[in-house]
Curated annotation (Swiss-Prot):
Organism superkingdom: Bacteria
Gene Ontology, cellular component aspect: cytoplasm
Location in the cell: Cytoplasm
A GO molecular-function annotation: fatty-acyl-CoA binding
Origin organism lineage: Bacteria, Pseudomonadati, Pseudomonadota, Gammaproteobacteria, Alteromonadales
Keyword field contains Magnesium: no
Transmembrane domains' residue ranges: none
Species of origin: Shewanella pealeana (strain ATCC 700345 / ANG-SQ1)
Subunit-structure text: Homodimer.
This protein's UniProt keywords: Activator, Cytoplasm, DNA-binding, Fatty acid metabolism, Lipid metabolism, Repressor, Transcription, Transcription regulation
Protein name: Fatty acid metabolism regulator protein
Function: Multifunctional regulator of fatty acid metabolism.
DNA-binding region: 34-53
Domain HTH gntR-type: 6-74
Length: 239
């Protein structure tokens, strides 16, 4: 098992998670005793204990006082916060994961974009007020797009959408930088932003779903033209 990590805690966490992913520690099984596991991984028991607590918070494990640590079925117990981990664990499936992520985001964003323009059109107008100053670079577009999503999610009146976005911020940011490296993708996005801006000015929230649907289809086609050339390390976080 080859694991790239920046320190003992990171190594231990990735070792355990990969072992769960590869069914060496299958769902429902009991982890080895703390001393045995710390020796197996090569970290101190203190470090291991901290890692186990963190993995329990993320839904990988169940820790109960006086009982052995049990491995969970993470598909049932974890949240969006493990998306980046799954991307690292399954690089061959990363393009499909991104497809699913973008599809889910498009479906959800149609709801909160409409809500934002209905409930707080002034905030939507403000968020889109500096389009002429947006630098024509992948980094600038990726940052603007995420911030726009975040602002409108919060302005929609349902802050839970913000938490959903926060769950895949790192992964979405990296994919966004790659997607917006295409000048055509940036031009497509700018056209969408301008149309959205006009809807906000007109307080026309009823036409937002149709605009979102059209942009979702067009950006999806654009993504399909780019996905096969994605860098192999795009799914890896900096941790």
């Amino acid at each position: 098992m080859i694991i790239n990590a920046k320190g003992p805690a990171s190594f231990a966490e990735k070792y355990i998670v990969r072992s769960i992913w590869e069914d060496k520690f299958p769902p429902g099984s009991i982890l080895p005793a703390e001393r045995e596991l710390s020796e197996l991984i090569g970290v101190t028991r203190t470090t291991l204990r901290e890692v186990l607590q963190r993995l329990a918070r993320d839904g990988w494990l169940t820790i109960q006082h006086g009982k052995p640590t049990r491995v969970n079925n993470f598909w049932e117990t974890s949240g969006l916060n493990i998306l980046e981990t799954i991307a690292e664990l399954n690089p061959d499936g990363f393009p499909e994961l991104v497809d699913q992520l973008l599809s889910a985001r498009s479906s959800v964003s149609a709801i909160y974009f409409r809500g934002a323009i209905r409930n707080n059109p002034e905030e939507a107008i403000e968020a889109l007020s500096h389009l002429s100053e947006l630098e024509d670079t992948a980094q600038a577009y990726a940052e603007f797009d995420y911030q726009l999503q975040h602002t409108l999610a919060f302005s929609s009146g349902n802050p839970l959408y913000v938490l959903i976005l926060n769950g895949f911020k790192g992964l979405y940011s990296r994919v966004g930088r790659y997607y917006f490296s295409s000048a055509e993708a940036r031009a497509l996005a700018m056209d969408f932003y301008k149309q959205l801006q006009q809807l906000a000015i007109d307080k026309n929230y009823t036409d937002v779903p149709a605009l979102m649907r059209t942009y979702g289809i067009n950006s999806g086609v654009m993504w399909q033209s780019l996905r096969d050339d994605m860098p192999v390390d795009l799914g890896y976080s900096d941790n």
